[in-house]
Amino acid sequence: MFGEYSVNNNQSDSAARGPRPDSGSALGNLPPESASFVGREPELGHLNHLLRERRLITLTGVGGVGKSRLALRAVTGGRQTRRDGVWWVELSPLRDPALLSATVAHAVGLADHSARSLDEELCAWMADKELLLVLDTCEHLVTECRHLVGELLQSAPGLTVLVTSREPLGSPGEQVVEVRPLPCEGPDSDALALFRERAVAATPQLAAVFDEPGRAAVATEVCRWLDGIPLALELAGARLRLWTLEQTARRLGARFDMLADTRTALVPRHQTMRTAVGWSHELCEPLERLLWARLSVFTGDFDVGAARAVCSGGPLPASRVERVLAGLVAKSVVRRSEARGAGTRYTMLDTIREFGLDWLTELGEVRTVADRHAHWYAALSRAADRGWLGPGQVDWYRRMTAEHAQLRTALEHLLGSDPTAALEMAGALWFFWFSCGHVHEGRAFLERAMRAAPCTGTAYTQALWALGLTALLQGDMEAAQRLGEECTREAARLADPEPELRAAYLHAVAVMMPGDAARALALAGPRARAGHGGRTSGPGWLLCRLATSYALCDLGRFEEAAEEARGLHEACAELGERWLRAYADYVLAVAALGLGEHGEAARHVRAMLSGKRLLGDRFGIALGLDLLAAAVAALGDGELAARLLGTGHAWWRTVGRPQMGGSPSLTALRDQGERQARAAIGDAAYESAFRGGAAATTG
């Protein structure tokens, strides 16, 4: 993420080492190619030419024709490079158009901590970038994509956008390229090559069959029946586990002959694709068809535990879901992949998912299965809330990041069907909104849930607190203070002391950030000492200790601050917790700087950055880089301090906030480091080193 900077100073203290920009690796987030790419050399050449010459290219075509595969192939392997990377935005799981900007921001590594609209923030962030943005599967968001792409292209002259969609955006200057099915004629056709490869991948012994004299003509007939549509060919290839080529050709022929005289509003290729999917559906076992239908409520990928919980019932017991799911994978209806930190995941292509949803509607189960999906992810959110400040924190971060699309879908459903459950779920996800870079999105969900649900009780108080945290990170201190006061009043009505401690933390930080450390200490200090109803445990107590240590630093009481932070650090270490422990390291670093222990300060900042890196906490990384620069400047290495400040500047841009988050005391530390660095190496050398650091990667 930010590598390893080395420090050059006269002290032997290796603690004054921090991040070094990565080099030699391509920037971006391109997904791996799920299978080998067959054919389309002319299309690839044309598309690569357009990507060098035009700024907006849209690949159109029927579902299953290979738009996404062609786009991915065109931008991988160094075929397209940009100074600031190639970024892939998967829009297929997105159902709420209001979250389009948040989805794009998250994909490109822009955390949404600004109070400005995300459209504005994206435009400002991309203004000086040279990058290629791929928006994949836009047909259900055409109007919103047209608006956002127009704004981005106008604001960012170095931006190129590649879109895949079943229909064009209709934007000025858009270059539309229709992706056609693969050619089917001849023994060397692309369609035949793809059919053969997918069939052999499913059943390796078929390689010899395709080489037999006369079999190529039969395989070509299958390709013609399926119009050379790649997804249809893949589904047919999977059937060769059970049938010969000749049986497949005969059954397909019978299927299409039956439909030949049927009146339909579908254009031929759409009809071919839907017929091929329907044929695969008919050939599934009854339980496979049922699971296919129920899986259609998932948006994006999912794991087997979720499939078991959401899709079991009636004739499909939970104990059989995994085996039936494996059958759908074998038939190429469901795709299986391994995700780093998230284990085995499953997904369906949109065309297949849409067919399943139609079948689920026929079964009359849409509401029932959607309810089960929503309540499963609500329960997962509550479990993550309970486990966040514990040894499984990094695993929870990775798990919930992988489940982002499902969390959105569940919240949207609950907002319409069970607002109280939506409120509880949105509040339980406080750590996801606050710690994992989804502040705009979290604030929007929380505000919607609070408008829809009763304004009282534990769930409402928790939501107030979570909303206040999002306001804090957006720099909306007026709202944060107001919410802190309201949360304190609501918490006092509850029997549980935990909400009172959380409210005290929110209120304290909300008054401390603008500069009132004395009041912050008065709010958090007594609760940090008293603990959780007399017990020194629980998240609220830990947070109050953090606020207390911050306030003591701001008041210049560095020894007391260090003592408080050490106690917090030890408590977090006992829990196996990383997020708060990293902030304890941050306070220890600030206190060490105040006490003149510059090497010790650098050591603590490095520990802090290590923890924040594990959890993708961009705000924390930005804070840490500026503080490390101050420590390094105090140690006498002005050049490295300038580079670190430049890198910190790049990270602050990814959170859309001013450096040091706007806090007067923290800004003063950063400014002191800059003055010392300039004094050590001069303004010209400082600016050069700063620019070098600012070019560091933040992906």
Stretches with model-predicted labels:
Residues 1-25, 639-699:
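C-terminal non-catalytic interaction modules
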Residues 225, 396, 403, 415-416, ...:
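Alpha-helix C-terminal capping/termination sites
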Residues 387, 423-437, 459-477, 498-516, ...:
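Tandem amphipathic alpha-helical repeat scaffolds
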